[in-house]
Amino acid sequence: MNNELINDKINILVERAKIARDEYLKLNQEQINSIVKAMSMAVQENHMLLAKMAVEETKRGIYEDKITKNIYSSEYIYHSIKDNKTVGTIVDNEEEGYMEIAEPIGIIAGVTPVTNPTSTTCFKSLIAAKTRNVIIFGFHPSAQQCSVATAKILLEAAVKAGAPKDCILWIDEPSVDATKALMNHPDVNLILATGGKGMVTSAYSCGKPALGVGPGNVPCYIHSSANIETSVNDLVLSKSFDNGMICASEQAVIVDNDLTNQFEALMIKAGSYFTN
């Protein structure tokens, strides 16, 4: 697809998003809370199906762990934000003479990874709806189908609960160029980017607010006072979860000298390998 056609498609999505953005402004806190609850419950009802789709399409990860991530991104995230005030006056401090008023930022570009496609789509959709923001997704090309399925479930639930019909949109023909065009569109107000280093760097280079999440170098320090068996067990469980694709899983371990031999023996016993 050439750049002109890509830009035309992005422009159409953004124009639809503008209408939904204006419709969101008419909703009150109670209505927004009902919408977010409905979206969360819809994903919870389909968490196993979406996990299966993610593993089959991407050929990555572990089915049971994808289930856990879908439950976390729907149920846990919902309960962590459900009582937050996000509409109108959220703070009225008469003593210090100030008020805080919550307003949506507008249109969000949501970039999702191949490693956590369904759970990231759910999470970003929930926080966008909670804050009355329209989100347009640029899904990873290798996870398009499972990501679209998740977005459709969320959109249907949201609209039934009273949300604007285009509150969740996505690029139908995904590509790096299409995602970059979305992020750089002048009417996109915020970028939520989860992906590889290159994509996150691109998001930060767009000249607008961007929140990026990418691979991290996560160290773990095991002190001599630690329960070494528990520490090793936790490390192996964490690093092997969903075949180690979580950005926040441990990448390096620093161990006190007097624990080195015991640590290495327990790691090998747990099925780990030392490559150098």
PLM regions with names:
Residues 1-99, 127:
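N-terminal Rossmann-like NAD(P)+-binding subdomain of aldehyde/semialdehyde dehydrogenases
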Residues 72-73, 146, 221, 253:
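Short secondary-structure boundary/hinge segments and terminal tails
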Residues 4-7, 122-123, 129, 200-276:
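ALDH superfamily catalytic-core signature
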Residues 26, 30-40, 44, 48, ...:
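Aldehyde/semialdehyde dehydrogenase
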Residues 89-230:
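Rossmann-like NAD(P) dinucleotide-binding subdomain of oxidoreductase/dehydrogenase enzymes
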Residues 21, 36-39, 109-111, 136-140, ...:
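Short glycine-rich or small-residue beta-strand-to-loop segments that form or flank ligand, phosphate
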